[in-house]
Design a protein with these regions (language model features):
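N-proximal low-complexity "stem/linker" segments adjacent to membrane-targeting elements
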Residues: 2-29
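Short, conserved active-site loop motifs that form the nucleotide-linked donor/cofactor pocket
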Residues: 7, 64, 142
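Short catalytic/ligand-binding loop motif for oxyanion handling, primarily in non-cytosolic enzymes
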Residues: 18-19, 42-46, 74-77, 127-131, ...
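Short, well-ordered alpha-helix to beta-strand connector turns
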Residues: 31, 61, 116, 139-140
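Short beta-strand-to-loop acidic/aromatic patch adjacent to the donor-nucleotide binding site
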Residues: 34, 113-128, 133
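Short internal beta-strands
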Residues: 35-39
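Active-site-proximal specificity loops/subdomain of glycosyltransferases
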Residues: 41-118
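Conserved catalytic core of nucleotide-sugar-dependent glycosyltransferases
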Residues: 95, 126-156
Length: 156
């Protein structure tokens, strides 16, 4: 039996509630599910509180899967035992933390979605315009979107 293809939008979340709400409203008609992954550590390795609040997005809550990353990656470089500069180690470890968070999204996708589903992965502020593009009829394996670039500042 052929499964119906789904479109899943995935992001890593830090603390951009207004931006995420904008993303939900823009993509809601085109996306079947949203995966939001938030870590308990910043990219710099500082412990942080969780900021995502599903209650803020009641209208979309049935489409949102929220993943919490409780742990740090196992392969972080120790500043003291490395012959690299502190800045280089900092950047490498930040990339490892980002990868670790993305890996948690991948595990969720592998567990609950099919190989014929479309996966959109981008930063919160990189919102693809799906208005004139039908992923359900697209035969390509990979799609890159041209996007408009906006500089913005929000006041909470």
């Amino acid at each position: 039996k052929l499964k119906v293809m789904k479109i899943i939008d995935c992001i890593t979340y830090f603390d951009e509630p207004m931006l995420f709400e904008l993303r939900l409203n823009i993509l809601n008609d085109y996306v079947d599910n949203f995966i939001v992954c938030e870590a308990r550590y910043t990219h710099a390795g500082k412990k942080k509180d969780l900021n995502f609040d599903i209650k803020r997005y009641k209208k979309f809550s049935n489409k949102i899967t929220y993943i919490i990353v409780e742990d740090e990656p196992k392969n972080l470089i120790d500043y003291n035992s490395s012959n690299k500069s502190e800045n280089v180690v900092f950047r490498i470890n930040a990339q490892k933390r980002i990868y670790h968070q993305r890996e948690k999204i991948f595990f969720e996708l592998k567990k609950n979605y099919d190989s014929n589903d479309w996966i959109i992965y981008s930063d919160s502020d990189e919102i693809p315009n799906l208005m004139d593009f039908n992923l359900k009829t697209c035969k390509n394996k990979v799609v890159l979107f041209n996007q408009l670039l906006f500089y913005y500042k929000t006041h909470h």
